[in-house]
Protein backbone atom coordinates (compact mmCIF):
# COMPACT_ATOMS: atom_id res chain seq x y z
CA UNK A 1 0.00 0.00 0.00
CA UNK A 2 2.90 2.35 0.74
CA UNK A 3 4.23 1.99 -2.82
CA UNK A 4 0.81 2.78 -4.28
CA UNK A 5 0.61 6.01 -2.27
CA UNK A 6 4.06 7.06 -3.45
CA UNK A 7 3.16 6.41 -7.10
CA UNK A 8 -0.07 8.40 -6.85
CA UNK A 9 1.68 11.30 -5.11
CA UNK A 10 4.51 11.33 -7.65
CA UNK A 11 2.11 11.26 -10.61
CA UNK A 12 0.01 14.08 -9.14
CA UNK A 13 3.13 16.18 -8.57
CA UNK A 14 4.32 15.50 -12.13
CA UNK A 15 0.89 16.44 -13.49
CA UNK A 16 0.97 19.81 -11.69
CA UNK A 17 4.49 20.52 -12.88
CA UNK A 18 3.62 19.77 -16.51
CA UNK A 19 0.33 21.62 -16.28
CA UNK A 20 2.03 24.74 -14.96
CA UNK A 21 4.33 24.88 -17.97
CA UNK A 22 1.50 24.93 -20.50
CA UNK A 23 0.04 28.23 -21.54
CA UNK A 24 -2.91 29.00 -23.66
CA UNK A 25 -2.15 30.54 -26.98
CA UNK A 26 -3.68 33.90 -27.68
CA UNK A 27 -4.89 32.78 -31.08
CA UNK A 28 -6.95 29.84 -29.91
CA UNK A 29 -9.60 28.74 -32.43
CA UNK A 30 -12.19 27.49 -29.96
CA UNK A 31 -12.13 29.39 -26.63
CA UNK A 32 -14.03 26.62 -24.82
CA UNK A 33 -11.17 24.13 -25.34
CA UNK A 34 -8.46 26.62 -24.52
CA UNK A 35 -6.70 26.52 -21.16
CA UNK A 36 -6.87 30.03 -19.77
CA UNK A 37 -5.57 29.43 -16.23
CA UNK A 38 -2.05 30.56 -15.45
CA UNK A 39 -0.94 27.95 -12.85
CA UNK A 40 2.34 29.69 -12.04
CA UNK A 41 0.59 32.65 -10.44
CA UNK A 42 -1.83 30.58 -8.33
CA UNK A 43 0.29 30.51 -5.16
CA UNK A 44 -2.29 28.74 -2.99
CA UNK A 45 -2.22 25.65 -5.25
CA UNK A 46 1.55 25.45 -4.90
CA UNK A 47 1.21 25.92 -1.16
CA UNK A 48 -1.09 22.90 -0.98
CA UNK A 49 1.34 20.84 -3.08
CA UNK A 50 4.27 21.78 -0.83
CA UNK A 51 2.29 20.96 2.34
CA UNK A 52 1.30 17.58 0.87
CA UNK A 53 4.92 16.83 -0.03
CA UNK A 54 6.08 17.76 3.48
CA UNK A 55 3.43 15.53 5.06
CA UNK A 56 4.52 12.67 2.80
CA UNK A 57 8.15 13.25 3.79
CA UNK A 58 7.26 13.27 7.50
CA UNK A 59 5.30 10.04 7.09
CA UNK A 60 8.21 8.33 5.37
CA UNK A 61 10.63 9.53 8.06
CA UNK A 62 8.45 8.26 10.90
CA UNK A 63 7.96 4.92 9.11
CA UNK A 64 11.73 4.46 8.74
CA UNK A 65 12.28 5.46 12.36
CA UNK A 66 9.71 2.93 13.58
CA UNK A 67 11.23 0.16 11.49
CA UNK A 68 14.69 0.89 12.89
CA UNK A 69 13.47 1.00 16.51
CA UNK A 70 11.41 -2.17 16.19
CA UNK A 71 14.31 -4.09 14.67
CA UNK A 72 16.56 -2.98 17.55
CA UNK A 73 14.04 -4.13 20.14
CA UNK A 74 13.66 -7.52 18.45
CA UNK A 75 17.44 -7.97 18.34
CA UNK A 76 17.71 -7.18 22.05
CA UNK A 77 19.88 -4.10 21.57
CA UNK A 78 17.48 -1.91 23.49
CA UNK A 79 19.04 -1.57 26.94
CA UNK A 80 16.21 0.11 28.82
CA UNK A 81 16.54 1.45 32.35
CA UNK A 82 16.73 -1.10 35.14
CA UNK A 83 13.53 -1.73 37.10
CA UNK A 84 12.80 0.63 39.97
CA UNK A 85 13.57 -0.40 43.53
CA UNK A 86 11.11 0.36 46.29
CA UNK A 87 12.28 1.05 49.83
CA UNK A 88 9.84 0.58 52.68
CA UNK A 89 10.65 2.34 55.96
CA UNK A 90 8.83 1.33 59.12
CA UNK A 91 8.53 3.64 62.14
CA UNK A 92 8.31 2.43 65.73
CA UNK A 93 6.02 5.28 66.69
CA UNK A 94 3.94 8.00 65.10
CA UNK A 95 5.89 11.01 66.37
CA UNK A 96 6.28 12.38 62.84
CA UNK A 97 2.57 12.05 62.21
CA UNK A 98 1.75 13.62 65.56
CA UNK A 99 4.02 16.60 65.02
CA UNK A 100 2.65 17.12 61.52
CA UNK A 101 -0.96 17.03 62.67
CA UNK A 102 -0.19 19.24 65.65
CA UNK A 103 1.40 21.85 63.40
CA UNK A 104 -1.58 21.78 61.04
CA UNK A 105 -4.27 22.01 63.72
CA UNK A 106 -4.68 25.70 63.11
CA UNK A 107 -5.42 25.02 59.44
CA UNK A 108 -7.68 21.98 59.68
CA UNK A 109 -9.25 22.59 63.08
CA UNK A 110 -11.27 19.70 64.54
CA UNK A 111 -10.46 17.40 61.63
CA UNK A 112 -6.77 17.41 62.54
CA UNK A 113 -7.57 16.51 66.13
CA UNK A 114 -9.77 13.66 64.93
CA UNK A 115 -6.95 12.31 62.76
CA UNK A 116 -4.60 12.64 65.70
CA UNK A 117 -7.02 10.65 67.87
CA UNK A 118 -7.14 7.91 65.23
CA UNK A 119 -3.34 7.86 65.06
CA UNK A 120 -3.12 7.53 68.86
CA UNK A 121 -5.63 4.69 68.97
CA UNK A 122 -3.87 2.74 66.23
CA UNK A 123 -0.40 3.28 67.61
CA UNK A 124 -1.42 1.84 70.98
CA UNK A 125 -3.02 -1.26 69.41
CA UNK A 126 -0.12 -2.63 67.45
CA UNK A 127 3.44 -1.45 67.86
CA UNK A 128 6.37 -2.91 65.98
CA UNK A 129 8.72 -4.89 68.18
CA UNK A 130 11.46 -2.64 69.53
CA UNK A 131 14.02 -5.43 69.26
CA UNK A 132 14.37 -4.92 65.51
CA UNK A 133 17.84 -3.57 64.79
CA UNK A 134 17.41 -3.30 61.04
CA UNK A 135 14.50 -2.39 58.87
CA UNK A 136 12.39 -5.26 57.59
CA UNK A 137 12.79 -6.50 54.04
CA UNK A 138 10.37 -5.66 51.29
CA UNK A 139 8.41 -8.90 51.54
CA UNK A 140 8.17 -8.62 55.35
CA UNK A 141 6.98 -5.02 55.10
CA UNK A 142 4.26 -6.02 52.67
CA UNK A 143 2.87 -8.52 55.17
CA UNK A 144 3.02 -6.13 58.14
CA UNK A 145 -0.20 -4.47 59.20
CA UNK A 146 0.03 -0.87 60.30
CA UNK A 147 -3.61 -0.55 61.33
CA UNK A 148 -5.79 -3.08 63.05
CA UNK A 149 -8.90 -4.02 61.10
CA UNK A 150 -11.98 -5.33 62.89
CA UNK A 151 -13.00 -8.87 61.99
CA UNK A 152 -16.35 -9.43 60.34
CA UNK A 153 -18.99 -9.28 63.04
CA UNK A 154 -16.84 -7.26 65.44
CA UNK A 155 -17.59 -3.63 66.04
CA UNK A 156 -14.79 -1.12 65.66
CA UNK A 157 -14.05 0.77 68.88
CA UNK A 158 -15.74 4.16 69.12
CA UNK A 159 -13.44 7.13 69.52
CA UNK A 160 -14.37 9.90 71.92
CA UNK A 161 -15.74 12.90 70.03
CA UNK A 162 -13.71 16.05 69.72
CA UNK A 163 -15.15 18.95 71.79
CA UNK A 164 -16.00 20.94 68.66
CA UNK A 165 -17.88 17.95 67.23
CA UNK A 166 -20.04 17.42 70.31
CA UNK A 167 -23.57 18.33 69.38
CA UNK A 168 -26.59 17.01 71.12
CA UNK A 169 -29.08 15.37 68.79
CA UNK A 170 -32.47 17.07 68.81
CA UNK A 171 -34.97 15.56 71.18
CA UNK A 172 -38.14 13.96 69.87
CA UNK A 173 -40.24 17.05 70.63
CA UNK A 174 -37.80 19.31 68.77
CA UNK A 175 -37.73 17.02 65.73
CA UNK A 176 -41.55 16.96 65.54
CA UNK A 177 -41.56 20.74 65.88
CA UNK A 178 -39.18 21.00 62.91
CA UNK A 179 -41.35 18.68 60.82
CA UNK A 180 -44.48 20.68 61.73
CA UNK A 181 -42.81 23.94 60.71
CA UNK A 182 -42.16 22.53 57.24
CA UNK A 183 -45.86 21.70 56.82
Swiss-Prot record:
> What is this protein's name?
Transmembrane protein 52B
Major localization listed first in the record, in broad terms: membrane
Q: Which Pfam family is one of this chain's hits? A: TMEM52
Basic and acidic residues bias locations? 163-177
Its subcellular locations are: Membrane
Regarding the membrane, this protein is recorded as: Single-pass type I membrane protein
Q: Which UniProt keywords apply?
A: Membrane, Signal, Transmembrane, Transmembrane helix
Return the annotated region ranges for Disordered. Answer: 158-183
Signal sequence segment: 1-24
An example Gene Ontology cellular component term from the record? extracellular exosome
Q: What is the lineage of its organism?
A: Eukaryota, Metazoa, Chordata, Craniata, Vertebrata
Q: Which domain of life does this protein belong to?
A: Eukaryota
Return the InterPro entries for the record: TMEM52
The UniProt transmembrane annotation reads 40-60
